[in-house]
Amino acid sequence: MTKTHTERPEGKRRAPKDREPKASTTSNRRISPPRPSSRGDASRQGAHEKAGGAGLSHSAPGAVVSRRAADRLRRGHLWVYASDVESITLPDAETPPALVPVADSRGLLLGTALYSPTSQIALRLVSREAIGEAEWLELMASRLRQAVGRRKPMLDGENDACRLCFSEADELPGVIVDKYGPLIILQLLARGLDSTAVREKCVRVLREEMAPAAIVERPDPRVRELEGLAAPSQEPLWLADAGAKVASTRFRLNGLSFHYDANAGQKTGAFLDQHANYAAARDWARRLGATGRALDVCCYQGGFALHLAEVCRRVTGVDTSRASLEVAEKNLEANRPRLAAEVDWVEGDAFAILRDWSDAGESFDAIVLDPPAFAKAKRAVEGALRGYKELNLRALRMVRPGGLLVTCSCSHHVGWAELEAAVAAAAADAARRVRLLERRGAAPDHPVVLNLPETEYLKCLVLEVE
């Protein structure tokens, strides 16, 4: 049953997650930067040409990036922000190419990148060499096969859903592929990927490797707007049965059944990055004996709540979205009688509900906090930390002694130390002592690449509250 609280919070939203791995050694080949605009630049270019730096002609397409960006790329990063593009020469400004060679200010080749003229991330490196579109398509197919191959061992009788490709973390910037049971969802999040050739290559690899019932492209409207892209066709990219309907299906995580709708929900539809943490919350509640009453705050479609319902007698899920809570109820019913707990859903603002309930003296054996990203930019970190502290303060006042608190942040810009400091400050204000049991991140199908810090965004603290 869904209850309505008077105040409504933000819906649970997450920023797209694009990441990337360690790079190979930079080539010493050179490209000539665009014709200089100042006498000093001309002198430097002349010195370079006298040194024997052969390369592309001045009219050839190519991007010249700042020293800061070049150093980042050489350390293994894959992004160049628009502010670090010193100059760019295009064959046709009206129709920018998908790929451009990238060089430093001396003309040394750094690689080939997807080009996004309207995005803050202007260049996404796909190779450390100079390659053309045909080579890129074959390289993309090879990397996608490798990414899928790394995930196959993660799929078993308990789990038939996972992230098959995680963008930069699998050396495929802007490419997201998620598997939900028999359905595969594709997201293409960069302008340079918006082509029939790219879609056909992805579909071919996914058909051969996974034999799905359907492959559907699900756009991220916000990202496509930033990239200056129109919405793709709503028709499936591929169907095993031409007459089949693929809008909805079911998938399994940790043995539990979940509803999936390709036309609803956030991100690609579910939060697969948390699936290992769902099981960890359940297991820690059992170990601590925190099996009475549990609370899942910002519960979305019930991931933590349903796992806690395996070991707790009563579970309450709170979210701002009625549509999400309706799916959570479907998920609950699909797992009866395995889940014997009493479960109820409350629609409303997490901050208001926690404030009201903590003031009223409510108590729980286990509480999970999984709010949306509070800091989508560095300038928002200070406010985000206040939000994390407030949520944790209210939760800590309600956790019974010896109970469990699982608190999460999906804000990349909020680091581990900052999150832990916010929780420690909340514990001090609540006059509670907390013991850190585990630091957890995203599930293994969302790997972190150390050369690309942006791939680490999800942080999960498992705490025993005294």
Task: Please name every model-derived segment.
Residues 1-181:
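Non-catalytic accessory regions of SAM-dependent methyltransferases
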Residues 133-135, 139-160, 185-235:
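Cysteine-centered catalytic environments shared across enzyme families
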Residues 165-178, 198-271:
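Non-catalytic substrate-recognition/targeting regions of SAM-dependent transferases
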Residues 119, 192-193, 266:
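Short, surface-exposed beta-strand-loop junctions and turns on beta-sheet-rich folds
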Residues 239-466:
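Rossmann-like S-adenosyl-L-methionine
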